Amino acid sequence: MNTVYSLSKPLERRQSVAVTVGDVLVGGRSPIVVQSMTNTDTADVDATVAQVAALWQAGSQLVRITVDRYEAAAAVPKIRERLERLGFVIPLVGDFHYIGHKLLSEHPACAEALAKYRINPGNVGFGAKKDRQFAEIIEIACRYRKPIRIGVNWGSLDHVLLTRLMDENAQQENPLSGGEIMREAVVQSALHSALWAEEMGLKRDQIILSAKVSDVQDLIAVYSTLAERCDYALHLGLTEAGMGTKGIVASSVALGILLQKGIGDTIRISLTPEPGGDRTREVKVAQELLQVMGFRQFFPVVTACPGCGRTTSTVFQQLAQKIETDLHKNMSVWREKYPGVESLKVAVMGCIVNGPGESKHADIGISLPGTGESPAAPVFIEGQKVKTLRGTHIAEEFELLLSDYIHTRFGQG
């Protein structure tokens, strides 16, 4: 007898130390957190507030902002205050490079306003200054009781560490490849920095690690190694993933494999937006990834067939698109009005081949007639055929049935 493989869910989540960032819990047994980052000039308070709010409304639970100079640091408390006046309580993460120690020490209001600090051990300082400047940031994090993310990036890797590992490797009888040494340097940089932060007084539940590279296979290897060697909460992301379809595919493959292995506590899909493009797209992709893998439910799922020669009409495509658009548009209200509606499954199918079957598997579904079929559209609710629609108003009638079903199933009154 042939072997039948069974995999009903991803592997058990790696048990990590939970970290509180503002009012969001990262790691432990908490749901995987979606986060994003602004691309505005942080010193431009109006633009940054608008983008942070847009990212949060799209579903980003944490939003990172660049703090690269004194004007940006001075703007941070104003940004938080403005957001709170607008009703947005959003944990802001400060992204620091090169002079983070100065910005945090000279702008205590900035240090207080941020919910977390991101530090890159590869550029926190150089030579004799590195240890002192890293220590300054950790001392400030301890003082204000803020968590940190030690974010290693192979584009700004600690060259002293890398050189040492390469020299040691050269002395081995069977030396590792350059790629293996690079990956080991990324892992060691993150772990050594985290242990050092603990020695300086930062608690284990105040530390999140990330180790970003731009190659899919390297990213999988780095995070798999990191997950084996520690229990810190892990932030997943493929750096410089790129634009459009390529960026989405690369990030989804890399993060999807790691998530399937139980690795990852918070994710960011780093997409390069087109000029004037929508920054919130990366948030939606992250949500879609977690939802299709079964980790979280953010919005109802609309199943629709791709179409073929049996579906020369575009009616089912138009209906599927309209329903999906309407569902997403209404979710901000429906989450409060109809608790659990994000688990809804709707099927809009184009012909008799798979239409009835897929519609039965959905909570509510419709099988529209294909080319040459009888102009009738059976509707199924929770596996049972409840009605057959005919005529020129099939789409409108199905939308009414869908609305009634949502109200009946998820309404609280």
UniProtKB/Swiss-Prot annotation:
Enzyme class: oxidoreductase
Keywords on record: 4Fe-4S, Iron, Iron-sulfur, Isoprene biosynthesis, Metal-binding, Oxidoreductase
Gene Ontology terms, MF aspect: 4 iron, 4 sulfur cluster binding; 4-hydroxy-3-methylbut-2-en-1-yl diphosphate synthase activity (ferredoxin); 4-hydroxy-3-methylbut-2-enyl-diphosphate synthase activity (flavodoxin); iron ion binding
E.C. number: 1.17.7.3
Disulfide bonds: none
Substrates-to-products reaction catalysed: (2E)-4-hydroxy-3-methylbut-2-enyl diphosphate + oxidized [flavodoxin] + H2O + 2 H(+) = 2-C-methyl-D-erythritol 2,4-cyclic diphosphate + reduced [flavodoxin]
GO biological process, one term: isopentenyl diphosphate biosynthetic process, methylerythritol 4-phosphate pathway
Pathway noted in the entry: Isoprenoid biosynthesis; isopentenyl diphosphate biosynthesis via DXP pathway; isopentenyl diphosphate from 1-deoxy-D-xylulose 5-phosphate: step 5/6
Family stated for the protein in its record: Belongs to the IspG family.
Name of this protein: 4-hydroxy-3-methylbut-2-en-1-yl diphosphate synthase (flavodoxin)
Origin organism lineage: Bacteria, Pseudomonadati, Pseudomonadota, Alphaproteobacteria, Hyphomicrobiales
